[in-house]
Amino acid sequence: MSRHQARKRFGQHFLTDDSVVEAIVRAIAPARGDRVVEIGPGLSALTQPLLRGLDHLTVVEIDRDLAARLRNAHAPGRLTVIEADALTVDFASLGERLRVVGNLPYNISSPLLFHLMAAADTVRDQHFMLQREVIDRMVAAPGSADYGRLSVMLQSRYRMDKLFDVPPEAFDPPPRVVSAVVRMVPLPADRLRPASEAALQAVVARAFAQRRKMLRRGLGDWAALVPWDALDIAPTARAEEISVEKFIRLTDALLQAGAVPA
């Protein structure tokens, strides 16, 4: 079979280091009966070892040439190929207790993470390889330089752990950045949740639009409607100092005041 040329428009960097593959598979720990979906299988570096531990695997591949290779290499009873952009896939329709894995295209990683949030109620866990700097932002604590919109939104929905770094030389072609692997486990149904996810997104986006501004200025005309003392938030605080819990309570207060549409 001819060698596949990585395509920049799809952000393709193929994992070639067997030791990294083994470490990722150990972290996932696939088992018979698991319902696993792999995003961006590429040249099957993860696909093959995953299949050894599974009855069946579903993959999402946008590259039609790679999708054809996958179909030709595996029996339909073992592998289902969804030839599509992962941003258009309704993951919630793929079953309950999904385990979603993959070496995500770095050029769409943040939009894809937000897209997957819509299916979090049907997901058991997620294991992804991403740029290290993105994962550092995902798991960042309030008060740190990496803490921002991505941190708040994802931490409101998942417990996340950065597992290990992956050097550029583990890929072909090597990316210009260090990568890392993250585990994401949806928080339970009884978690603190906003009355409206859309409202939380709106509040967090406005708060971090000018992250160095004091919150009372960053929120603009909403600031006058915030019960600062009741929320135990200093109006002079900056967005990067506000915990996820306080962002959720702030959002609910602004919803009750009619400032933010649900």
Swiss-Prot record:
PROSITE patterns: RRNA_A_DIMETH, SAM_RNA_A_N6_MT. GO terms for cellular component: cytosol. Signal peptide: none annotated. The keyword Metal-binding does not apply. Its main location: cytoplasm. It catalyses: adenosine(1518)/adenosine(1519) in 16S rRNA + 4 S-adenosyl-L-methionine = N(6)-dimethyladenosine(1518)/N(6)-dimethyladenosine(1519) in 16S rRNA + 4 S-adenosyl-L-homocysteine + 4 H(+). It holds the Pfam family RrnaAD. InterPro entries: KsgA/Erm (IPR001737), rRNA_Ade_diMease-like_C (IPR023165), rRNA_Ade_Mease_Trfase_CS (IPR020596), rRNA_Ade_methylase_Trfase_N (IPR020598), rRNA_adenine_dimethylase (IPR011530), SAM-dependent_MTases_sf (IPR029063). GO terms for molecular function: 16S rRNA (adenine(1518)-N(6)/adenine(1519)-N(6))-dimethyltransferase activity; RNA binding. It is found in: Cytoplasm. Keywords: Cytoplasm, Methyltransferase, RNA-binding, rRNA processing, S-adenosyl-L-methionine, Transferase. S-adenosyl-L-methionine binds at residues 13, 15, 40, 61, 85, 103. It comes from the Bacteria. Its EC number is 2.1.1.182. Gene3D superfamilies: Ribosomal RNA adenine dimethylase-like, domain 2 (1.10.8.100), Vaccinia Virus protein VP39 (3.40.50.150). Specifically dimethylates two adjacent adenosines (A1518 and A1519) in the loop of a conserved hairpin near the 3'-end of 16S rRNA in the 30S particle. May play a critical role in biogenesis of 30S subunits. Belongs to the class I-like SAM-binding methyltransferase superfamily. rRNA adenine N(6)-methyltransferase family. RsmA subfamily. This is Ribosomal RNA small subunit methyltransferase A. It comes from Bordetella petrii (strain ATCC BAA-461 / DSM 12804 / CCUG 43448). The gene is rsmA.
